[in-house]
Amino acid sequence: MANYGTKIDEKWQKFWDENEVYKFNPENSGKKLYTLEMFSYPSGAQLHAGHWFNYGPTDSWARLKRMQGYNVFQPMGFDAFGLPAENYAIKTGIHPQDSTLKNIETMEKQLKSMGAMFNWENEVVTCLPDYYKWTQWLFLKLYEKGLAYRKKAPVNWCPSCNTVLANEQVVDGVCERCSTEVTKKDLTQWFFKITEYGDELLDKLDGLDWPEKTKSMQKHWIGRSYGAEVTFKVKDSDLKFDVFTTRVDTLNGVTYVVLAPENKLVDELTIPEYKAAVEEYKEAAAKQSEIERQSVSKEKTGVFTGSYAINPINGKVVPIWISDYVLATYGTGCVMAVPAHDERDFAFATKFNLPIERVITDKENTNPDLPYCEYGVLVNSGKFDGLTTDEAKKKIVEELEKDELGAMKKNFRLRDWLVSRQRYWGAPIPVIYCDDCGIVPVPEKDLPVKLPYNVEFTPDGKSPLGKCEDFVNTTCPHCGKPAKREADTLDTFVCSSFYYLRYVDNKNDDAPFDSEKVNKMLPVDKYVGGPEHACMHLLYARFITKALRDMGYLNFDEPFLSLTHQGLILGPDGLKMSKSKGNTISPDDYIKEYGADVFRMYLMFGFGYTEGGAWSDDGIKSVGKFVDRIERILENCRNIINSNESTKDSIDSAEKELNFWKHNTIKGVTEDGDKMQFNTAIARLMELTNALNKYTQENIKNANFLKETIVDFIKLLAPFAPHFAEEQWSLLGNNSTIFNEKWPEFNPAALVKDEVEIAIQINGKIKAKIMVASNLDEEGIKAASLENETIKENTEGKTIVKVIVIKGRLVNIVVK
């Protein structure tokens, strides 16, 4: 009867806690290893299998590294502000603060029942004043450096969540949280100037040990391009506007220009005759998402403003249109249209019967079909005819620069980070508005600006804090006159943009962190979390790290040196888990039945860690049986060790065979575990389990050698089944934790066998197997094979045509 279960888990969790086994000591001599899992949102009542898949296997990796001599720092906390927690509170009718703190309490218990070696003394909870004081401090520091600013801008608005969304929170035109179609709305908002770091955010990516797909996503999101900014003057007007283009070589082919419907110039450019049509078009465009507007398959629409622009390179007059395929948020919000050499412009010109003029041909001058979008040679471009695209770009910009009508320009797809939210459950923005003094940052000594409890937070499109008179009404820190507080709260991603720094010095009341401590502990060596954060949290954290570095607080460039994305655990039906589908997996139920280590090992053995897959009850049952089998075999081994019967001191073939499997397993588990290939690491342990079981069947056994083997076996097992391994370790008579033991090292010599098994085939069919010396040459192997009695019988009376030897594996005898 197996003994392992939750009682064993509880026993060793108590031992670890009472003996402070995992308490981090920064003075330890071991090489530091900052291991971090993305902290959890406490928006639901409990942890699910996905949390476990993030935290459990990563903890096993950290345990392995600890036993290899690393001084592991593995803190845990909660990303407690934001829409998920607020929506949960609205759904349940419980105040966000009460529901969030209760959920955290539950999740803490669940995380502790996992048996992970989290450094709970370094815990952070972002919704507590002792944390968001430093979120507000960060805002003030960015404001001081000109990296936080306020402006009126068209923003993404979710009518269901009743709040603004950052560009990164809009997926395929809908809100990533509730899937409601996102619209545009003009609001005065706070932004962080992440674009200031566009070049470095892009250039430093290649040096990071991150998944290539994630790096590619960030590169695309940042979207650096090189081109020219060209100034078009409006005919019969003092107005002018700039366009950004990567194909200034086609400037002579411009036959019209297009402005985004939201462009501020549109109202000034539109003549009365076209006013009604333009206004109607603007309203329709505002209801569409940017994704929809940029769709290649979408039919092109637009309206003429009645005004004309002057092409700065040739003086030609071209009409000014507005169209929704031009976005106010990209470039200048104005596009020079060259229909002969751009597919979207070509479709637009074809529909509205606008001129199409070729200005680029191929090098053979064959006049390829239009639109021709490749590089080539200029035609119909006056003095620039005959130049290649690259030559023309340089010459045309030089010509424009003479009249101050153009210049080389670098552009980014990346937009500044919108951080204002019209919701309650977030860190208040530490700003005061005074009629006399304008925008006044809250003095640092007055932080934190506390979030009031008694607030009506049901979303109605307005900031809930604006309805709380006690909060909003204050006095100006400069002049002492009545003033108003900012009623918006900060995007929760601001809280998570620096939490990895606060962990190191979480009890510091005077600063967000001690720079000396942080610079010693950071960057994070291994970061684990979902790939959905590629263009949000992971990008924002990089920006904040660089900004704090430039302020003198940090001496490193990047927050996370190595990044791993865990896969997704699906329901038993192969679909994403959700309560509505009834396919969710509750870890608590399985832990009660099997124990935390079986649950952990199933997650590591049943799935590739970066891939995930569908949950299987049969799978966890199999792992449970495997642990039971280990328990029986180890008990048998202990009985053999403690018995004086049928033992020996010599190392013979059976011991050499077991020693081979031991060192083969040490090598495999070390290599696979280090690469987070947990499923193959556990498969290696299964091989050693089989070898151990086989050895116990020997008539005479070497008890001392057997003990050495199971000592190493339990050490290898420990990261993957920590409670179970501690119990087995103690049953060997040890009083200290196994996690203070040194990780086994493999001996290459042990992997060289004295003898190897050779399969002998006759005409491709195996007829016998023999053991030969591992260093035997081909002639010796051939001779030994032909001397085998079974082979003699099968070749008698036949002609041996040839004998093929594959050393160390097989012999094939061809007969006729």
UniProtKB/Swiss-Prot annotation:
Catalytic activity: tRNA(Leu) + L-leucine + ATP = L-leucyl-tRNA(Leu) + AMP + diphosphate
Pfam families: Anticodon_1, tRNA-synt_1_2, tRNA-synt_1g
Top class in the EC scheme: ligase
GO molecular function, one term: aminoacyl-tRNA deacylase activity
E.C. no: 6.1.1.4
GO BP: leucyl-tRNA aminoacylation
Positions that bind ATP: K579
Superkingdom per UniProt: Bacteria
Motif ('KMSKS' region): 576-580
Keyword ATP-binding: yes
Family matches, as HAMAP family: Leu_tRNA_synth_B
Family, per entry: Belongs to the class-I aminoacyl-tRNA synthetase family.
Name of protein: Leucine--tRNA ligase
